[in-house]
Amino acid sequence: MGVQGLKTYIESSSRNDLKTWAFRDKQLIIDGCNLFYSLCFDSNLDQIHGGDYDTFEKVVRQFFENLSACDVHPYVVIDGGDDHTDKKWDTLLTRKQKKIKDAYDLSVGKRRQVLPLLTEKVFKQVLKKLKVPVVQTLEEADWEIAALAEEWNCPVLSNDSDFYIFNLRAGLLPITHFHWRKVRVNRKTNQKFILSKHFIARKFCKSFKMNVSLLPVFASILGNDYVKLPNIKNRHWERYSNPGSENPQIEGLLNWLSQFSGPDEAISALLRPTSNKTKAQEELSHGIQDYKLVPGSLAQIFRSTKVPQKISKGPLHVLPRWTLRPILDGKMSSYIINVLLHNRASLNAQVEDFQLPSANETSLHIRQVFYGLLLLGEQQTAGKRESVKGTTKRYVVEYSRQQIKRSSENVEAIQTKAMEGLRLETLYQEPHAVRLQVILDTLGVSCEMLKGTPDALQLQMFVTRYWLVNAEPQPCRVHLWGLLLGMVYGKLSSSPNAQKDMLSRLRVKASRKGGSVDIDVAHAYSQWQSCLKYSLNLNYLLSFPLTEPDCASLYRGSLVHQAVGELRRGISLEALLVKGSSAERIFKQLKDIIVSLMGDDFIKKMKSGLEHRDAGKTQRASKGQKDELDIYFEQMMIESIDSEDEELLDVRKSKAKNHLMELPVCPIRARHKAKARNARHPCKKYERRCFE
């Protein structure tokens, strides 16, 4: 939701609608999706390399720790599926195209904002660790957030301009003006607080001598995500504005509305010159109703484990009863709501090679199994059973991309042998072994492979195996080693006994200013992240037959891209690991697992990736420009070269030979072959060490 231009108008220098508030010791209803977008985009975090999730986790932790220091009690509410009426669908499609274009622009070095794929999952995991109360609604959360805030008489934290329209007694705290990074202390009381700005709709309307009940009419006329009335919106409202107004259309409309005592009188005046009065009145009435607050369901959901009966009535009855609590708790992805309710799914574009099919193509088989569990089999709850004429097949419309254009395609839901006889209504009651076999078959993993992999590493390693087998173009060895080095970093950085010196040397400040990226590396890792995301969704639906990994420790984009760059510059893998270190031990464990899953011959036959060592340079700004990561490593070597032991520079060569294992390949839609990028440019090889 959102009223275009309203937030800017209220924050303009000529207005005085935001009042300073030393915020502390209150309940706070937080717009969760708005918050994680803000924390990601306002913290200068990596986006071009696919995200630095460990750094994002630290930002989220700091935010809630600062709230706690000020005795603020947060309640986080996250959006669920699309509205069952589909009244916002056109807006969502428009945003989909914009997000694709933003991802493309970022991939070619322009400054854009693209949310890394696993951001929401990491956000939810951090909230769980911190025991922050959180609810994921079944549909859009804005109305539920406002209703709860009014019921509990506490403010809302959000940047969504729709909360300027809701008549909330306790008002709105815009995230933009919520200075949480610097906790202040009241010298008189010695109490900590967060300096913020506070908006009250009643006081805003008072400045125009306008009835606050007219604000929903105002929002409906200007148009939000739900209501579009171009003939009424474009009536030259600026003629009612004051001279020198920073936004004459908004101010003029507010001045015009102030002459009416209430919504009915204003609507009558609006409709007089309108030809299609019935349709316009219907649109206005629906728009006004969207802002009418009555007690919702969130209070009961936050305070009780019991699911309110009313939340799954009507179209939402397609959701099996057992899925409701996991969805509300944020444990199960709201992705299933759109599949069951609308028979569609929207796939996020990432920083990838836009000349190739979407990186999400690699995870297609995983999604098809997911759709099969939701849509196939005997389901008493099945509401919309649309199928192609003459067949019993079920399809989901996937919205993705073809190059930089939004596209849609019917994707068949499939049923594997392990899924025979399974019903969605009773899926959670199936034995663990049955649910486990479904995800193992999907990822192409045998029982022998399962036994040889520690529980805590199973999901991430099986996803990596699936990626290596199914990704096109096939990942190179440097992609694999870079990914594993990132996991080593994540493991060590999350350990309380981590080698601090090693960690400080590996930290790289991500650059958002035209930062270079090797597009083949970005595409490969976007494919891996897509496989991980949809494997996590499948694992949730199957009630966690595999241990859920800590996503923040699995991928640090700036580091893995940096590692690939070092390998392509001639640094041997052994030289990146210090002999006898924890890093070497963990890397060897991960490498041994992958070799056992893939077979030694498969690894040896993979392309090295060194033939692309200069590929990224010709796709970015200038050939002579040195990457910030390269400069970082040069500085690191100057600092450490004098104190290094000669023994640590010895390159160790592994002579282990493993048998080739048969690799089941999952069916994937046909893709275009990647074009050759650049000829190989040999460069001088030299050795450096990253892990100490």
Curated annotation (Swiss-Prot):
Q: What class of enzyme is it?
A: hydrolase
Q: SUPFAM superfamilies annotated for this entry?
A: PIN domain-like
The record ties this protein, via Gene3D superfamilies, to: 5'-nuclease
UniProt keywords (A-Z) are:
Hydrolase
Tell me yes or no: is Plastid among this UniProt entry's keywords: no
Q: What GO terms are given for molecular function?
A: 3' overhang single-stranded DNA endodeoxyribonuclease activity; single-stranded DNA endodeoxyribonuclease activity
Q: Which InterPro entries match?
A: Asteroid (IPR026832), PIN-like_dom_sf (IPR029060)
What EC number(s) would the UniProt record show? 3.1.-.-
**Keyword flag Cell wall biogenesis/degradation:** no
Q: Which domain of life is it from?
A: Eukaryota
Role this protein plays: Structure-specific DNA endonuclease that specifically cleaves single-stranded DNA and 3' overhang DNA.
> Which protein family is it in?
Belongs to the asteroid family.
**Which PANTHER family does this one have?**
ASTEROID PROTEIN, PROTEIN ASTEROID HOMOLOG 1
The name under which this protein is listed is Single-strand DNA endonuclease ASTE1
What gene makes this protein? aste1a
